[in-house]
Amino acid sequence: MVLAGAALVTSGVAMGPVAKYAVQYPEMFSTDYPTWAAWADLLLPVLCGAWLLYYGGRAFKGFGMQRQKLGSPLFAGTVPLYFLWKLIWRFQFTPASVYRMPCALRVLSAAAALLFAVVLIKVFLVPGLPCGHTLYAAGTGAYLLCTGLELPQTLFEAAHNMLTLPDLAAGLGIGLLGLCGLFCAWEACGEEME
C-alpha cells in the first residue's frame, strides 16, 4: 500500500505543470481535456496516494490488528473516486476493436482497482465486519488484473518510451495496488486449521 501510494502521489505531482498551464492558458484546452480535468488529474492521485501512504504506514505499526475505526470516511472517499476517475478516463478511449486490446485491459484493471479500493475502505472503516470472502475475491481480482495485466503492460510501454511520467507512475501505482490485493487475499485466508 505504501509503494502504491508513493507512486500515485508521484503521478499527481507530475501533473502539476499541466494544471498550472491549464490555469494560465485555458483557451489552449479543448473540450476533449477541459481545465477541471487537469485539476482532477492533479488532486485525485495526490489525495488517494496520501491515504494509501498514511494507512499503509499505520498497518505496518500494528493498527491493522486492533479492532478500532481507522479513519474518516470523507478522506477515504478519494481512493475509490480516483480509481473511478481512471476507469471513466480510460473507458472513453476504448473503441470496439481487437487492435485496442491494451486499452481494454487497462479498463479492466481500473475496474478491479476500484472494486478492491472499495473493499479495502470497508475493512478499514468498519472494523470487525465479516468480509473475508469479499476481501479475498477483490484482492485476487486486483492481483490478476492490476499486477498481472497492468504492470507488465506499463513496463513494456515504458521500455519503449510510450508513456509520460504521470501515466507511468499511475500504472505502477495500480500495479502495486494489485500486490497489496495479493497480500490481503493471502491474509483473508487465515491460518491453516487441522
Question: Predicted regions span which residues?
Answer:
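Membrane-interface helix-loop-helix junctions at boundaries between adjacent transmembrane segments
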Residues: 1-43, 58-69
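Transmembrane alpha-helical segments of multi-pass membrane proteins
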Residues: 1-10, 69-85, 134-145
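Short helix-loop boundary/capping segments
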Residues: 75-81, 85-90, 100-120
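Alpha-helical transmembrane segments of polytopic membrane proteins
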Residues: 1-4, 11-12, 33-51, 102-114, ...
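Juxtamembrane "helix-exit" motif on the non-cytosolic side of transmembrane helices
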Residues: 13-28, 86-98, 150-161
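Membrane-interface helix-boundary motifs at transmembrane edges
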Residues: 59-72, 123-133
